[in-house]
Amino acid sequence: DMQDMEFLSFYGAEMILEIARFWSSISTYNPDLDRYEILGVMGPDEYHEAYPDSDKPGVNNNAYTNIMAVWVLTEALKVLELLPEDRKNELCEVLALEDEELGLWEDISRKMRLVFHDDGIISQFEGYDKLIEFDWDGYREKYGDIQRLDRILEAEGDSPNRYKASKQADVLMLFYLFSSEELKNLFDRLGYPFEYETIPKNIDYY
């Protein structure tokens, strides 16, 4: 409607374009894979702040982060298409947005890397499948309440970074925020398979 268009034109567009610019700025091109990657981040799950025994913070290619980046970039490009020509030109001038940068957004939004386990499970981040399975039953038996698992492990001189254990929904957040159709479109755009069973399979795993 008219009010939405007005908001988009004068406030929303500038915000989403700047957010897209941020995602573009933290994407790194990997020439060996011809894919873009987002390195050294923490996804929604606070149990994984770094790789086991690494002194560098963050993990690489968190699926939630990478998909959200692709979504923002595609929405930003759509917004520019929606704006009246004069407003679009004005915004591009104010933000110093040129065709080359928009071309980069387009490229990143089609070549962002996602990582999968061998069986097609979406990896929470690169290397998640190499982590150790956590002994949930053993720890419940030993401690009863293991809600603060991070504190329990740290008291034992251990860290949740080593285990397949999550404090917050991470990959699963994607299925909450996007419909299966939206996710299929994003995966298709990236050239990755998204089957009918992808969602139940991942929900079951995580």
Model regions: which residues?
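Conserved functional hotspot residues or short segments at active or partner-binding sites
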Residues: 16
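Short conserved active-site loop signatures built around small residues
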Residues: 13
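Alpha-helical support elements that line or immediately flank enzyme active sites
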Residues: 1-5, 20-24, 171-181
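Active-site core of glycosidic bond-cleaving carbohydrate-active enzymes
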Residues: 10, 66-67, 74, 78-81, ...
